[in-house]
Amino acid sequence: MTKQKKIISVLTAAALLCTGIGTAGISQPLTASAADSIESSMDWDTLNIAGGGFVSGIITGDDQMYARTDVGGAYRYDYEQKKWVQLMGFLNEADRGFLSVDAMCVDPNDDDTLYLLCGCAYFSGARTAIFRSRDAGETFEEIDVTDLIQVHGNGYGRQCGEAIAVDPDNPDIIYCGGDATAGTSGLIMSEDGGDTWKAVDGYGKLDLFEYEINWPTWTEHKVKTTAEKYDGGANGVSTITITDGKVFVGTSIKGKANLHVAEVGSDDFKPLSEELPTEQMPSRINLDPDGNLLITYINGLMFDSGTGYAYKYNPKTDELKDITPTTTSNGTAKKLNVGYGGVFSDRHDSNKLVATTCAQWYSQSWTADAWDRDAIAWGDRFF
């Protein structure tokens, strides 16, 4: 592939505020002494301009926490200052498509090594790049992978994740998935810490990217993806996890096996389990401290995730357990089969789990005195 790599220094943009001084509408010029007085009495610093967009993912390591957004770049949490720090202020207008961060991961052995998968179908020539930082986002290197995969970080399914992962046993090995591919596979890998990338042809031979579409729609640039149009469900690879020498890859398709596993470095991908659903799509895979996979499913990528499930899979024993949360109605407990955004484990206790629904609209039923006004909160549920 033609690989573009750039070293980028993260600079903070400064905003200069100008204040007019006058009396009764009459402009009065400032003398040198007045200007000196103002300069000495003011504190001058950069203006903090907060980012925007949908926060589509948060990842944590031992010491660092990062967030990604669909149009506002990526952030690192400053625990001392108790604020989020923008990491992508170096991007210019021509590269604004990279503010759509489709996926991210850290090296499990080093929180300061961060990878961001970025791209937007309708900005910056629909280019896709992986940004690598080895200093917690202070500086980045850009590796262009457009000729292998393409992503739309502001597209449907962007809440799924993460579609990039580092092998904890060998951090030079990284797997990354796209929404679309102009090459032979929607899954790529690096064996040199992200310097170079190649297609994983074994995944490509599964023929999960079966539709050929124009990307973007107003061009003649042909790609293969998992849906008939990019703005309705072309989410491609939704989630990747690497553990115990195996790579697990979830794909946003229905009607066939959509969660596959292979030995790291192998092209022999197989369905993980016949017991897993095929009429829903994997949304996220997390690990508990015992090495079990916590897998969640959704039925839609847009504003209603529909039905779904949650599972725990033991890769050592191949045991699969349905851990979908339950609700109680009229004294009877039943599975709440709605779309789930993820199940997360306490880093030190695999028995402590938190599950969250995805794109559901529930009354939270908090008591009125828990809020500033007498109203009911609406949103997703936590278990």
Regions found by a protein language model. Name each.
Residues Q28-F383:
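Extracellular glycan-interacting surfaces
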Residues I21-G22, M281:
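Intrinsic disorder/low-complexity segments in short proteins, especially the signal peptide
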Residues T12-I21:
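Hydrophobic core
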